[in-house]
Regions:
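Flexible coil/turn and secondary-structure edge motifs
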Residues: 1-187
């Protein structure tokens, strides 16, 4: 699905996603880094609440995020869906059987997840980290790089900053009037 910054933001903004992490998977190079990725692919790890979001919903978002019929030549950006369990692999197979895609025409690889190496801190929540006001708020709240990476709020805000699923005023609880007093705020 290309560079992991975009999918990190897109999935982070999805209702039901708890956290996202970017990293490297699918290769044999020991301890991959961005500078020495070897045969790994940039990957996104998504944790979600199954009470609010199904695995099929996650797959829908993944397959809508790229053209699964397109073969990407560069290993770093290949289209791969990694499955962590046999149940996920079976669900993915059923999803593809029920989809509009011709299985023979799908270039997106499906592989078991053999390992996931976290990407460097500057890649985590990249869009959010590009906004000084946001990083200042998290830093002042005592967050370090690992806390930011693991934060559900940071995952969501990273998506909003990148322009995904931005809530409207009603979803934010902002009233329809032009005055803060009408929203129950003291002037």
């Amino acid at each position: 699905m290309g560079c992991f910054w975009g999918p990190d933001a897109k999935f982070g903004a999805m209702d039901g996603v708890v956290r996202t992490r970017v990293g490297y998977a699918g290769g044999t190079t020991p301890e991959p880094t961005y500078a020495d990725i070897g045969d790994h692919t940039e990957a996104l790890q998504v944790e979600y609440d199954p009470e609010r979001l199904s695995f099929a919903d996650v797959l829908d978002a993944a397959f809508q995020s790229h053209d699964p019929r397109h073969r990407v030549g560069k290993t770093q950006y290949q289209n791969i869906v990694f499955t962590a369990t046999a149940e996920q692999r079976d669900a993915l197979s059923s999803y593809l059987d029920d989809s509009e895609y011709d299985r023979e025409g799908i270039e997106t690889r499906i592989e078991p997840l053999d390992g996931f190496t976290l990407a460097e801190p500057y890649h985590q929540k990249y869009h959010l980290q590009s906004k000084r006001w946001a990083t200042t708020v998290f830093r002042e709240a005592g967050y370090d790089g690992a806390d930011l990476r693991e934060s559900p709020a940071a995952a969501t805000l990273n998506g909003y900053v990148a322009g995904h699923d931005i809530p409207d005023a009603e979803q934010l609880g902002v009233g329809s009037s032009d005055s803060p007093e009408a929203d129950g705020l003291q002037g």
